[in-house]
Swiss-Prot record:
This is Adenosylcobinamide amidohydrolase. It comes from Halobacterium salinarum (strain ATCC 700922 / JCM 11081 / NRC-1) (Halobacterium halobium). Pathway: Cofactor biosynthesis; dicyanocobinamide salvage pathway. It is an enzyme of class 3 (hydrolase). Converts adenosylcobinamide (AdoCbi) to adenosylcobyric acid (AdoCby), an intermediate of the de novo coenzyme B12 biosynthetic route.
């Protein structure tokens, strides 16, 4: 699990000796004692993300570490919520100003331009006290993302936003868990925690969720059609 400290728009999630896997900025597999969630302004467009992160952490009283996973979000940290279940805890910041829709009857659009998306608005940090191998830790990212998509579809009608990110962590010294799928204690606990934390974060916000991509401040609809063929 992790211990939390919140100051000046930065949430520290401390888990000494943890192994992390991040899909966010400067992500990948790392060993670190903590991870961070940083709220950025709406007009955020730094020349150097690394310098920005370093400065924000220092200004908030935290010691910047290059090995620490960092998530960036437009959601204020006052809306962060943490859920615990069994061997898992999940921290979530959730907002839907930039929904990403995936219609099942696409009308044949085009691929979007490659450009900077708004900072992630549904971010998750999932940590377990179990020790996971490479495969189980990687699979936990998929489990968390699946639970996030199911929760958002049921709550808001969208599976995600244009810039969501997931960080997962395990305790290398904990009890070994060979698998992390949805039918395992780790996977099931993660799914429950994601559901509760995401809904609680959304419920903490005064702003209503958009009912369509068109009514959102930002967003995208994947209406391009892919070609299907037999191998």
């Amino acid at each position: 699990m992790f211990e939390t400290t919140l100051h000046d728009g930065v949430l520290e999630l401390a888990a000494p000796g943890a192994r992390w896997l991040s899909t966010g900025w400067n992500g990948g597999d790392t060993r670190a004692d903590r991870a961070y969630s940083i709220t950025v302004p709406d007009d955020w467009a730094p020349d150097s993300t690394h310098e920005y992160v370093t400065d924000r952490l220092a200004a908030a009283g935290f010691a910047p570490r290059d090995d620490a996973p960092v998530l960036l979000t437009g959601v204020a940290q006052e809306h962060a919520r943490i859920a615990r279940c069994g061997p898992v805890a999940v921290a979530a910041t959730a907002g839907l100003s930039n929904p990403a829709a995936l219609p099942m009857d696409p009308d044949g659009g085009t691929l979007p331009d490659a450009k900077r998306a708004p900072p992630g608005t549904v971010n998750l940090v999932a940590a377990t006290t179990r020790a996971l191998d490479d495969a189980a830790l990687s699979n936990l990212v998929a489990v968390a993302a699946e639970a996030k998509a199911a929760t958002l579809l049921a709550t808001a009608g969208f599976p995600g936003t244009t810039s969501d990110a997931v960080v997962v962590a395990c305790d290398p010294g904990g009890e070994t868990a060979p698998y992390s799928g949805s039918a395992t204690p780790v996977g099931a606990a993660t799914r429950a925690c994601v559901r509760e934390a995401v809904r609680a974060s959304l419920d903490s916000r005064d702003a209503a969720s958009p009912d369509s991509v068109e009514s959102a401040a930002h967003g995208t609809t994947t209406d391009v059609q892919a070609a299907v063929f037999r191998p």
